[in-house]
């Protein structure tokens, strides 16, 4: 399913937006429209957001093809519907409560962990990564010059959210069923299962991030975004050889946070 919004009107003579339409398409106007829709659930397309979440696991290329469609119809790469962000927030809250239950935390400790995870791990780290990638991509990866070839900050944040969602589901939901009875048993199989889930989750993040930037036709050398795979594979092998259980360390970190 694709949005049916009509193409942004342009001048028939030179293809340039009229002053009125140009104002409507400024970053500030787009940001205001996005934030305004955040408080109007009836205006959000949750069905389409769920479709995107499914395809981020099975065929993430299809998700970015829709970003191309949005650029053609609405003259912007970034999402203008916060439904995906809202659903991601719900996933984050539910999975964090699940972590609190698995780690035998009190209500207050679980609530404190939820605040940390939402505002620091998701929002704070997301803003930092998006801003860093926005700066790097515009400064070093743009193949052409001009306003039409700028990487939108909102798009870099969307790419982060797209990549973060599979990581969240794998590490904050699927992993919950293995923590107490497999991963934290102290056996090698526990370390293997836990670290393999981390390998898959971070691998998804790297790959979906690469797809997001390679989808922009005016960027060059996007293949460098796949280079971390080599370090990831090396770290995975090293962690198994040395017995580093990343999930055990995450659980200790979460418990330390809520003290």
Swiss-Prot record:
Biased composition (Polar residues): 1-11
One GO CC term on file: Golgi membrane
Keyword terms, alphabetized: Golgi apparatus, Membrane, Nucleus, RNA-binding, Transmembrane, Transmembrane helix
Membrane topology: Multi-pass membrane protein
Segments in the Lumenal topological domain: 104-109, 180-181, 244-259
Disordered, as annotated region: 1-21
GO molecular function, one term: RNA binding
InterPro entries assigned to the protein according to its UniProt record, in alphabetical order: UNC-50
Family, per entry: Belongs to the unc-50 family.
Protein name: Protein unc-50 homolog B
Species per Swiss-Prot/TrEMBL record: Xenopus laevis (African clawed frog)
Highest classification ranks of the organism: Eukaryota, Metazoa, Chordata, Craniata, Vertebrata
């Amino acid at each position: 399913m694709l949005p049916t919004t009509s193409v942004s009107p342009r001048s028939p003579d030179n293809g340039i937006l009229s002053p009125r339409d140009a104002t409507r398409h400024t970053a500030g106007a787009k940001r205001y429209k996005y934030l305004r829709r955040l408080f109007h659930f009836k205006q959000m397309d949750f069905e389409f957001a769920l479709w995107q979440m499914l395809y981020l696991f099975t065929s993430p290329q299809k998700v970015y093809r829709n970003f191309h469609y949005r650029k053609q119809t609405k003259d912007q790469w970034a999402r203008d519907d916060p439904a995906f962000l809202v659903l991601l927030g719900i996933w984050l809250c539910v999975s964090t409560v699940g972590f609190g239950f698995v780690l035998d935390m009190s209500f207050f400790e679980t609530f404190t962990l939820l605040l940390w995870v939402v505002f620091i791990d998701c929002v704070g780290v997301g803003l930092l990564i998006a801003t860093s990638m926005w700066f790097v991509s515009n400064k070093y990866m743009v193949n052409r010059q001009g306003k039409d070839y700028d990487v939108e900050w909102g798009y870099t944040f969307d790419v982060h959210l797209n990549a973060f969602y599979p990581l969240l589901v794998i590490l904050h939901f699927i992993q919950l069923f293995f923590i107490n009875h497999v991963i934290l048993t102290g056996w090698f199989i526990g370390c293997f299962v836990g670290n393999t889930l981390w390998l898959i989750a971070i691998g998804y993040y790297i790959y979906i991030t690469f797809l997001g930037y390679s989808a922009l036709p005016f960027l060059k050398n996007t293949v460098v975004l796949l280079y971390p795979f080599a370090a990831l594979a090396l770290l995975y092998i090293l962690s198994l050889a040395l017995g580093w259980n990343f999930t055990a360390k995450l659980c200790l970190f979460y418990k330390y946070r809520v003290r």
